[in-house]
């Protein structure tokens, strides 16, 4: 699984079925797909049929402007996605740096079920193997140097 901030500009219809979403120029999902494809190539494994990457978010409102999205979220009755209750083989965090308005949302991921948590720490140019704190910088995929993340995921996949 991967945990971002919010769906940004991506748009999806409300549905109980798997459907294609309109990315509206949002780059997170294609970037995540490419990272995982490259990790599978690096460890010389085929991507299993019907596999998927669970994308979780701090909150689930679509808005490319994070400040607007936070305001909408604060005034909404938005629910947390029930997928957050699953057990994940590993979780990669890409929610960015410190933002006091997001701290409570980040805190709930301290209880998420996974044996392996990691994020790219660009300040130290390394992978950290823990859940990032509210003040840690968990590098977003935008302008991310992907090679360290690809290497790390490929080792998990072996």
Model feature map: region roles:
Residues 1-86:
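A polyanion-binding, active-site-adjacent surface
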Residues 52-57, 91-94, 117-122:
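A structural signal for short, well-ordered beta-strand segments and their strand-loop junctions
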Residues 90-103:
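Acidic beta-strand-to-loop metal/phosphate-binding motif
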Residues 103-158:
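C-terminal capping/extension of enzyme domains
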């Amino acid at each position: 699984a991967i945990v971002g901030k919010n769906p940004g500009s991506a748009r999806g219809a409300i549905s109980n079925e798997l459907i294609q979403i309109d990315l509206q120029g949002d780059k997170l999902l294609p970037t995540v797909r490419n990272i995982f494809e490259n990790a599978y190539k690096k460890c010389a494994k085929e991507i299993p049929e019907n596999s998927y990457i669970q994308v979780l978010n701090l909150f689930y409102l679509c808005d490319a402007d994070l400040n607007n999205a936070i305001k909408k979220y604060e005034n909404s009755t938005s629910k947390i996605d029930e997928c957050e209750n699953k057990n994940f083989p590993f979780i990669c965090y890409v929610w960015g740096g410190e933002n006091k308005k997001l701290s409570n949302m980040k805190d709930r991921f301290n209880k998420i079920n996974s044996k392996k948590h990691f994020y790219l720490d660009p300040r130290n140019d390394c992978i950290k193997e823990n859940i990032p704190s509210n003040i840690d910088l968990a590098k977003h995929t935008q302008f991310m140097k992907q090679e360290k993340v690809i290497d790390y995921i490929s080792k998990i996949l072996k």
